[in-house]
Swiss-Prot record:
It comes from Lolium perenne. It comes from the Eukaryota. This is NAD(P)H-quinone oxidoreductase subunit 6, chloroplastic. The chain crosses the membrane at residues 10-30, 33-53, 60-80, 95-115, 152-172. The keyword Amino-acid biosynthesis does not apply. Coiled coil: none annotated. The lineage of its organism: Eukaryota, Viridiplantae, Streptophyta, Embryophyta, Tracheophyta. Its EC number is 7.1.1.-. GO terms for molecular function: NADH dehydrogenase (ubiquinone) activity; quinone binding.
Length: 176
């Protein structure tokens, strides 16, 4: 959006503040319905950031896909689970939880040490894509594809891993 500097900064700060509050709500609220609505608020704030960064296509895709589909699916799934099941489960810690926690912590620490030490620009083909984008020979959708395959390759892969893990978790919960 072409906004004056102070208004742009105020919207960015407001969006960041609401994003932090929504993220804390997702983690700290005990009622799963409230937590799912907080997740929807977080996704809407992320879409606001995309709008402020003049990436309208990604912002609308964020709203339609994540808020309009995935978050609504999460809310429906939580609503179908009986509320008494949440309070009956008194077995809070099992061996599988401990093993999973160790694996996740190991992966996070290995990523934290690997990502800063890796020269991502040597791996990716950014020079060719930047030349094509600067010449203006392609449209916006092709620019998004080129940027996803070059500049934003790592975040794109991390998002795909997060979606895969959430899909596996949903299947596991559905089988129980």
């Amino acid at each position: 959006m072409d906004l004056p500097g102070p208004i742009h900064e105020i919207l960015m700060l407001f969006g960041g503040f609401v994003l932090l509050l929504g993220g804390l709500g997702v983690v700290l609220l005990t009622n799963p319905i409230y937590s799912a609505f907080s997740l929807g608020l977080v996704l809407v704030c992320i879409s606001l950031f995309y709008f402020l960064l003049n990436s309208y296509f990604v912002a609308v895709a964020q709203l339609l896909i994540y808020v309009g589909a995935i978050n609504v699916l999460i809310i429906f799934a939580v609503m179908f689970v009986n509320g008494s099941e949440w309070s009956k489960d008194k077995n809070y810690w099992t061996i599988g939880d401990g093993f999973t926690s160790i694996v996740c912590i190991t992966i996070v620490f290995s990523l934290m040490t690997t990502i800063p030490d890796t020269s991502w620009y040597g791996i990716l083909w950014t020079t060719r894509s930047n030349q094509i984008v600067e010449q203006g020979l392609i449209n916006n959708v092709q620019q998004i594809g080129i940027h996803l395959a070059t500049d934003f390759y790592l975040p794109f892969e991390l998002i795909s891993i997060i979606l895969l893990v959430s899909l596996i978790g949903a299947i596991t919960m559905a089988r129980q």
